Swiss-Prot record:
This is Chaperonin GroEL. Keywords: ATP-binding, Chaperone, Cytoplasm, Isomerase, Nucleotide-binding. Transmembrane segments: none annotated. One of its GO terms (molecular function) is ATP binding. It comes from Colwellia maris. Forms a cylinder of 14 subunits composed of two heptameric rings stacked back-to-back. Interacts with the co-chaperonin GroES. It catalyses: ATP + H2O + a folded polypeptide = ADP + phosphate + an unfolded polypeptide.
Amino acid sequence: MAAKDVLFGNDARVKMLRGVNILADAVKVTLGPKGRNVVIDKSFGGPIITKDGVTVAKEIELEDKFENMGAQMVKEVASKANDEAGDGTTTATVLAQAIVNEGLKSIAAGMNPMDLKRGIDKAVIAAVEALKESSTPVTDNKAIEQVGTISANSDETVGKIIATAMEKVGTEGVITVEEGQALTDELDVVEGMQFDRGYLSPYFINKQENGTVELENPFILLVDKKISNIRELLTTLEGVAKAGKPLLIIAEDVEGEALATLVVNNMRGIVKVAAVKAPGFGDRRKAMLQDVATLTAGTVISEEIGMELEKVTLEDLGQAKRVVISKDTTIIIDGIGVEADIQARVSQIRGQIEDSSSDYDKEKLQERLAKLAGGVAVIKIGAATEMEMKEKKSRVEDALHATRAAVEEGVVAGGGVALIRAADAIKDLEGANEDQTHGINVAIRAMEAPLRQIVANCGDEPSVVLNEVRNGKGNYGYNAGNSTYGDMIEMGILDPTKVTRSALQFAASVAGLMLTTEAMITDAPVKDAGGMPDMSGMGGGMGGMGGMM
């Protein structure tokens, strides 16, 4: 086992604090509308330029192992805030730094670390309640646009495109961000349900120019088994041919004689038909087939419930306005499903999400919910250079997470004002003893830090602005973008409640662990074993080899 280095008490805390401050000082320069860029060197390719706090935090590794432990713990704050709310990483880092700095001063003055931590925790619980009380629900597109704009570092075009995407596919719809080919941002919306399964045979293609299958007003047959015998499909094919409509078959698989016969019928024009595999596997496939059935007012043909494929009638088939099938995807547009049935299915999936304890299951259920609740929107990022593209894509993804968080829990006044008001709301809170009360005051002072940092990044005087904001009420605050005071909500400066809440909770949690640290252990540096052995004696010995040539 490798030897270890151990530090105790104040020596350990001083080293840890140095690491905390190095990381936090690099991250906090990005905060606010006038936050600065950070340039990160990469071992390959050009440097990255970013204003994203978590990107900066993830790049920092310190040489001193004790200092690095402090830096990594603050990095954890940024990562947790990012995972929970998708934004607020810089705010969380600034809060953690403030709590650790204030707390360690108190410990150095002789206060009990455990009571200090209890006081901080008590203050945070009360502050979170105050934040929730001041939260305003997001009901209109304008608020979504404002949240997106603020999160994307005051880029109004980003706010607008996210608001438009949410308007088109719904707040629970699928919105993806990808790199585009143009200089400007573009929004591509796919109305309806899309899943990752393409046509089973290229002979189904009827749009040669783009290599897709397009079916207008098709019947949709949903089967929860493999189809290899064409006899099972004859009744359905005859009924569809008489109705004069195309047919889409979605089954576990279509193979052998059945697939060959479908291809021949399609090429001869007897029945316009296409077949795709059902999405997912096992129980998830069954559930997704049922989702499609709900969307298209069809029935899943399953032998488990006693239904036979040979006895299918046109009433069992689903219908949609249009279906587009490519090599890899199937899009069902405008299914004729009853709205009440679709909403009931959506509610059922929401219930399953709440009951599920697996992150993977939750993610898959969320995908199903999005497919049913709305279409799919793709935001294509435009930029002049690859470096700008990557920086902008990161900002748009942050803004998208922030707007989702805003829809979930509402919004509060931005610019650090909500935390100032929450701090004012808990100023009379007292702990069980003097040290706990001091811990509450540590948290209250730390909650001023984000506003102070935003103002400092603008080049203004933090204390002057803080006093002015303190003297105001409600949403009155400081607009760092143009150095004016006013109602933050009316000026469109909003923060999602979830982002502010998560930043405060995670910062206090990790800072509390640091304050109660009494020892730090790390691997001792490996001492150099010395240089290469002396080989000078080999010269003479090898000289005798000359006679062998």
